[in-house]
Amino acid sequence: MQMLTLAQQAKIASIELAQFGNVQKNHALLTIAEQLEQRSAEILAANAKDIEFAKNQGISTAIIDRLLLNESRLQGIANDVRNVAKLADPVGQVIDGGVLNSGLKIERQRVPLGVILTIYEARPNVTIDVASLCLKTGNAVILRGGKETKFTNAVLVEVVQQALETAGLPKLAVQAVTDPDRALLLELLKLDRYIDMVIPRGGAGLHQFCKENSTIPVIVGGIGVCHMFVEKSADQEKALELIANAKTQRPSTCNTLETLLVEKAIAGEFLPKLANRMKALDVTLHTDDLQKTEGIEPLDDARMRQEWLSLDLNVVVIDNLTKAVEHIREYGSQHSEAILTSDYQLARQFVAQVDAAAVYINASTRFTDGGEFGLGAEVAVSTQKLHARGPMGLEALTTYKWVCEGDYLVRK
């Protein structure tokens, strides 16, 4: 199919979809959840083909982990769809308004954006997450997954489209581009007459490609070079458990801890404890502040600007909070940053000085997630400042219009 035709169909579907209320949209979402469960064997069989292809291509274990679906993960996706159905529909919500001195009644109402293009790599869960959030907010969506998710996405999109038909909603409100040819993506990125927003979910290269080639507004984010600063007053035993959670719970995610900053005053006491705890969890430390033994490698400055997405952790000894903030400004990606401390004033100073979508005091960076933030399944995590920042839930997929009413009112 020509990309122009696909985008035109999406635009028409978005106009139709915007006319449906919350009841019809929720019916479609609940049908999607049911179909995911009923067709789980078919979905997992397709996913197994994608996993086999990925292994044959020598794709990293971190990427394969993102690609993998199992019964538990698939059930989690279905549950997320049901949770989206339970959320309040932001469309039509009156943000603010009133009657002006002129007598004009004015309201600012939330409305769908229109058509969303989402580009992602080895993340089949994104197919359903994005589709459900877009449907809830009355947006059509074009899904362009990576070649690694070819078989899984084909089944998932079929499930969604059948659910839309069952619910009486436009089937073409959710479409997929299955051809991995990048020339087709380039064509899509120029169709600003029909597509209203581009959301890339992948590595830094994908985000840069979209920024450089799109005539459509692009949401930049998802690159998580996340830091945690252990200040000298921190509870060291609790800190070790929190660091373990932030690094090892699911290393391949963008909200995983990548660089640990330790205040110099406690480094001699804390670093040996850290080394023992991380060794027990098979985490390799990259640092110049510990004797090189098994599980400890030299620090690589270039790697401090990248996501590990694996059981690797940079460790840097820092003089004080000011130096920690300077380090984060130099190496961070404005995603999620944390401080562990018992000093409230220093904590507030850290929050004020660190520029990131999410800043944590004595909590794991792993909380930067739409579900954990109470937003439902997220469409992305934005690290930019315009339109949306942080986990993007339902409201981030809407814009607003001014609705003005008078009694044949004229401007004087």
Curated annotation (Swiss-Prot):
Catalytic activity entry: L-glutamate 5-semialdehyde + phosphate + NADP(+) = L-glutamyl 5-phosphate + NADPH + H(+)
One cellular component term from this protein's GO annotations in UniProt: cytoplasm
GO molecular function terms listed in the Swiss-Prot or TrEMBL record: glutamate-5-semialdehyde dehydrogenase activity; NADP binding
Subcellular localization: Cytoplasm
Keyword Membrane applies: no
Main location: cytoplasm
Pfam families recorded: Aldedh
Pathway given in the UniProt record: Amino-acid biosynthesis; L-proline biosynthesis; L-glutamate 5-semialdehyde from L-glutamate: step 2/2
Entry's family note: Belongs to the gamma-glutamyl phosphate reductase family.
Protein name: Gamma-glutamyl phosphate reductase
